[in-house]
Design a protein with these regions (language model features):
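Glycine/threonine-rich beta-strand-loop-alpha-helix active-site module
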Residues: 76-136
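ATP/NTP phosphate-donor binding region
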Residues: 1-92
Length: 136
């Protein structure tokens, strides 16, 4: 067995209506301009996306959107998200949706502060700093 230390600070918020506090938590963790990343189907139909946007607006936070996540997300959307973060001055990536949205948003957050190709991370290259990231 290899010796190691694992440290993973995580903050969980659960409960009915908690999406209405999204803006509060984004601010608390240092976000000021947010990339909202989502698939598009149920998050729109349920009104979740609108409630998250309203919460961000209520806290005076700016945001840009990148929808269209499909199951087993494609790298093209990740590259698009990375460029959007860089060009728009985004400092917080917020995933609104399920597993594929979470996967691609983490890749966007890692790639937005990295000078190389985000795919390097999937080949074992270490990340030397972190980007603010959240999931709803």
């Amino acid at each position: 067995m290899e010796n190691f230390t694992f440290y993973s600070p995580t903050y969980f918020v659960f409960g009915r209506g908690k999406e209405e506090e999204t803006g509060h938590y984004v601010k608390r963790f240092g976000g000021s301009k947010v990339l909202i990343h989502y698939g598009g189907g149920s998050v729109k139909r349920s009104g979740l996306l609108d409630r998250v946007k309203a919460s961000l607006e209520g806290e005076g936070l700016e945001y840009v959107e990148l929808g269209g996540v499909k199951p087993n997300p494609r790298s093209g959307l990740v590259y698009e998200g990375i460029e959007l973060c860089r060009n728009e001055g985004v400092d917080f990536v917020l995933a609104v949706g399920g597993g594929s949205t979470i996967d691609s948003s983490k890749a966007i957050a890692a790639g937005a502060i990295y000078d190389g190709d985000f795919w390097d991370f999937y080949q074992g290259k270490a990340i030397d700093r972190r980007f603010r990231w959240g999931r709803f």
